[in-house]
């Protein structure tokens, strides 16, 4: 039997995940690199010259041109959260590495949060994943392995 490339594609192990995103500082650095890959750009005026300062334990960026202040989580699903970024990143990892759906109850147990919190985290993460992929169109040959299709069975009477 031929080896299925999809089943054996390299993923990110839990040990690899913890090494890459296991601390608050590493999660913060990953967000900065993702949001501003070429360096800070003011969302208000587009200027790149800025200063940084810490207020209430959070790093802020201030535009030198218009004095607009922002944080790395402003305007994201993390904006109003009291949870550490490490929990959000772990939730993202668990949701993206599972072959099947990860239940909110399972997230609750893995993350050590309430059911309501786990459910809201999952909802927000799935919403942004859907938004990002909604404009993407698959091209060429598309192979689907272990598809789970649902819905009510149509009666042929």
Q: Regions from the language model: what does each represent?
A:
Residues 1-157:
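Residue-level recognition of single "structural anchor" positions
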């Amino acid at each position: 039997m031929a080896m299925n490339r999809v089943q054996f594609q390299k993923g990110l192990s839990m040990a690899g995940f913890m090494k890459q995103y296991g601390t608050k500082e590493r999660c913060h650095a990953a967000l900065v690199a993702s949001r501003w890959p070429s360096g800070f750009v003011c969302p208000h005026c587009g200027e790149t010259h800025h200063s940084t300062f810490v207020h209430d334990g959070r790093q802020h960026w201030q535009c030198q041109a218009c004095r607009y202040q922002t944080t790395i989580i402003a305007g994201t699903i993390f904006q109003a959260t009291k949870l550490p970024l490490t929990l959000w990143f772990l939730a993202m990892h668990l949701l993206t590495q599972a072959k099947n759906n990860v239940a909110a109850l399972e997230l609750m147990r893995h993350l050590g949060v309430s059911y309501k919190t786990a459910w809201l985290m999952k909802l927000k993460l799935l919403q942004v994943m859907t938004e990002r992929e909604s404009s993407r169109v698959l091209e060429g040959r598309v192979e689907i392995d272990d598809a789970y299709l649902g819905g009510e069975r149509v009666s042929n009477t």
